[in-house]
């Protein structure tokens, strides 16, 4: 994975083959069989979509544990999940837990993943000055059977019209949650409009490297650090 010292990934979306893990750019097994997670294609014999969240959580926690030993050295962990993207495949321990069908179960498993990562930070005493961001790249997909979820009291896109893959706000407005005890007051809310492209400038602002970047770098990225700190929009 370009730009990362180490990585544990799948080559594409979970519904796109080849179905194998890549650890530091090398497959953990060869794709010798055919499996179908929406699209039939070459797969590792041991690879199962239902296990991905468990495996990504394990690798993330091992990374946090290892980095914690290098005291005083900052680290960056990017953990893009296969949930709640299609295929909707909650692990067996979560099936039937939500009462909202497979999608609700998948969301519960997603919550579990986040909780496990937070536990790893806690046991390594890294909570206070570690920024944790939880967000998404688009709104809920119609594959989740949104009308059925709404009837049961769950609005995956809140009150916004639309969903993933259309032009309406339900497809574009997403959660953006931050935990950073040393800097961000718990329970605060900002009305500032931001975009995931703003993460580049914001993180650069936090680590203080703004003067080292070329003038033409990240021209579409704007720091929202003032909003995180409870200050007025500084743009």
Describe each model-derived feature in a short phrase.
Residues 1-2, 87-90, 96-102, 106, ...:
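Histidine-centered active-site microenvironments of extracellular/periplasmic hydrolases
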Residues 5-14, 140-146, 150-167, 183-188, ...:
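C-terminal cap/loop subdomain of S1 sulfatases and analogous C-terminal strand-loop tails that border
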Residues 1-73, 81-92:
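Formylglycine-dependent
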Residues 13-16, 27-28, 82-86, 112, ...:
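Solvent-exposed loop/turn segments at secondary-structure junctions
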Residues 74-80, 107-110, 114, 131-136, ...:
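Beta-strand elements within well-structured catalytic alpha/beta cores of enzymes
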Residues 46-57, 100-103, 107-110, 153, ...:
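Solvent-exposed, acidic/flexible segments
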